[in-house]
Amino acid sequence: MSSRGKRKDEDVRASDDESETHAPAKKVAKPADDSDQSDDIVVCNISKNRRVSVRNWNGKIWIDIREFYVKDGKTLPGKKGISLSVDQWNTLRNHAEDIEKALSDLS
């Protein structure tokens, strides 16, 4: 007899011996952790649904420019937006004059 058939027979006998049936484990929802939001510093609201904030996430500081939406009375971040590292923010800030010049050239 092959080991494959033998193992199957053992499994059948083992399940016959068990008088209890085990229900799958229930998933327990994690409690909402607002500690991430407490690290957010809202710098300004750009429009009704857009804001700039500085936050600490995974031990790093990020400048977050993002759209938000309201669900069940809570304001939540949406997918549309960008999170800049401090280095990226400094690069953008150093080019602010170039951006202003390009805006004035197009106006």
From Swiss-Prot:
Pfam family, one: PC4
GO molecular function, one term: DNA binding
Keyword Transcription regulation: yes
InterPro entries for this protein: PC4_C, ssDNA-bd_transcriptional_reg, Sub1/Tcp4-like
Biased composition (Basic and acidic residues): 7-23
Superkingdom assignment: Eukaryota
One GO BP: positive regulation of transcription initiation by RNA polymerase II
Record region (Disordered): 1-40
GO cellular component: nucleus
Keyword set includes Transcription regulation: yes
Localisation per UniProt entry: Nucleus
Keywords associated with the record: Activator, DNA-binding, Nucleus, Transcription, Transcription regulation
Function text: General coactivator that functions cooperatively with TAFs and mediates functional interactions between upstream activators and the general transcriptional machinery. Binds single-stranded DNA.
Family label: Belongs to the transcriptional coactivator PC4 family.
Entry protein name: RNA polymerase II transcriptional coactivator KIWI
Gene source species: Arabidopsis thaliana (Mouse-ear cress)
Lineage, broadest ranks: Eukaryota, Viridiplantae, Streptophyta, Embryophyta, Tracheophyta
Designated gene of the protein: KIWI
